[in-house]
A protein has these predicted regions:
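Sec-dependent bacterial lipoprotein signal peptides
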Residues: 1-7
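Bacterial signal peptide processing site
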Residues: 7-13
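A small/polar (G/S/T-enriched), proline-flanked helix-loop surface module common
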Residues: 13-182
Length: 182
């Protein structure tokens, strides 16, 4: 599952993998498209287990980098976090870090993707948004971007007591921004 970021209109959507490559293309709402690459850092594990535990509200072990083969044959890369009590069936969170296929992250690049109802948190990175959880199938999701990277954090709703509040997401976003390379 590829994830991409937000808009000035406080919108967010998930991207779709392009067959045969590690680039993810965000569905365009307008005429332009945004392309994102996975596996842009040695590790997507930008939060410690303790930091992810504070965000999720349950005890979580340190993350493990993982490759996933998508249905189209492309390979996705992310850091997976598991609840301390539960083993591999306790998958609780994921961080995926992406960067543009060319250039740097810009407002224009972020502007064409979105899901209605996202909350934009001002003053955190280039942009930080929290997706709404309005249906049982929705996962708590936060996206934060700086000029080089887009970090996507997804929590598994059935394995956490409740979605994080804005303050918890903001702490996690700031910790991620500090962990990203300059």
């Amino acid at each position: 599952m590829a994830l991409v970021c937000c808009t000035a209109c406080s919108h967010v959507v998930g991207g779709q993998p392009i067959a045969g490559s590690d680039v993810h293309q965000a569905p365009a709402q307008g005429s332009s498209t945004a392309k994102w690459r996975d596996h842009v850092l040695p590790s997507d594990c930008l939060l410690t287990g303790a930091q992810m535990s504070a965000l999720a509200g349950v005890e979580i072990d340190n993350g493990l980098d993982a490759e996933t083969t998508n249905s189209d044959g492309s390979v996705g890369y992310s850091c997976n976090y598991y609840a301390s009590a539960g083993g591999v069936l306790s998958f609780t969170a994921k961080i995926k870090v992406q960067s543009p296929s060319t250039g740097v992250v810009t407002e224009q690049l972020l502007a064409d993707v979105g899901k209605p109802g996202a909350t934009e948190v001002p003053g955190v990175g280039l942009r930080m948004i929290i997706e709404p959880v309005t249906a049982p199938s929705d996962f708590p999701t936060m996206r934060v971007a700086d000029d080089k990277y887009l970090a996507n954090v997804v929590l598994v709703v059935g394995n956490i007591p409740r979605p994080p509040d804005v303050a918890a997401w903001t702490r996690a976003a700031n910790e991620i921004l500090k962990a990203l390379p300059a």
